């Protein structure tokens, strides 16, 4: 059984029933992302990706916050006083885990927004495949309130998930919105009362855990890449992903699914998965 107790200073990891619960652990700072946290999250994601007991990753925050964004003192004021090359390294670490690793992660990822979610936290939120928020969560793009535009890929995250007018409204005004509103505008898949958040997330994670991992990976990667390609390019690319998945799949899910549906008549693919 995977045991990551006390392995990282700013992140907690617990693997239960195939689900890796990754918790940003700076509650006294509303889980603001510091250079240390960014470095540790790179190690966390790379470690969990290779952990054969972890099939789905859930990202959340300790206490009453998902994350308040970047730590203004550690990430900005202290780093601003450092040599330029240090600033380059710090920015690279932030980008590496907040979107480069998460967006192309080999396993399904879910953001579980349990409270405050501000600024830079929008990058890992949107980089996760799916997201569930507590109704009571508070979201905000407050950068405008202290004199800068949204940093890193926050604007890109909004542009990819939220409509033009709504995205610009919150970027330009700095107003906050709730988890319920976030679900209506498409920033998260859905919202539930805080008291039901963990169970709802666990159920979704279990659903993903029980799917064929090779096929899930091909499906999510194909979707994310197809948005960047033309129709003609997509026809070639997505057929290639289909063929690749069949070649890499050790359990031959396509053959099993067809057999159980056409020959055994034990499943209805429109309503349920094949039996693995």
Briefly describe each language-model feature range.
Residues 22, 26, 41, 59, ...:
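Terminal peptide-recognition signature
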Residues 51, 105-106, 264:
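Acidic-histidine catalytic/liganding microenvironments
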Residues 36-40, 94, 101, 200, ...:
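Charged catalytic carboxylate motif
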Residues 1-17, 174-179, 199, 203-206, ...:
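C-terminal alpha-helix plus adjacent terminal tail
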Residues 1-62:
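Conserved CoA-thioester-binding segment of acyl-CoA-metabolizing enzymes
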Residues 100-213:
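Crotonase-fold acyl-CoA enzyme core
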């Amino acid at each position: 059984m995977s045991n990551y107790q006390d392995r990282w200073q700013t992140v907690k990891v617990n693997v239960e029933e195939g689900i890796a619960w990754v918790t940003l652990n700076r509650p006294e700072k509303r889980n603001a992302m510091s250079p240390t946290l960014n470095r540790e999250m790179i190690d966390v994601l790379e470690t969990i990706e290779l952990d054969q007991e972890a099939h789905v990753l859930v990202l959340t925050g300790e206490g009453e916050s998902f994350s308040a964004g970047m730590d203004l003192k550690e990430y900005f004021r202290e780093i601003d006083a450092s040599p330029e090359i240090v600033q380059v390294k710090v920015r690279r670490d932030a980008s590496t885990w907040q979107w480069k690793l998460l967006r192309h992660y080999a396993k399904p990822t879910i953001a579980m927004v349990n409270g405050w979610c501000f600024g830079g936290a929008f990058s890992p939120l949107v980089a996760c495949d799916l997201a569930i928020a507590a109704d009571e969560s508070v979201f905000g793009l407050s950068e405008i309130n202290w004199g800068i535009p949204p940093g890193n890929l926050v604007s890109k995250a909004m542009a990819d998930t939220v409509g033009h007018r709504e995205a610009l409204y919150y970027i330009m005004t700095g107003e906050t919105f709730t988890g319920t509103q976030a679900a209506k505008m498409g920033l998260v898949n859905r919202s539930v009362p805080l008291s039901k958040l963990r169970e709802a997330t666990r159920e979704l994670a279990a659903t993903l855990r029980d799917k064929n991992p090779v096929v899930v990976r091909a499906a999510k990667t194909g979707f994310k890449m197809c948005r960047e390609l033309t129709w003609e390019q997509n026809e070639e690319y997505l057929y290639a992903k289909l063929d690749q998945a069949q070649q890499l799949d050790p359990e031959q899910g396509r053959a099993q699914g067809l057999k159980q549906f056409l020959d055994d008549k034990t499943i209805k693919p429109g309503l349920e998965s094949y039996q693995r």
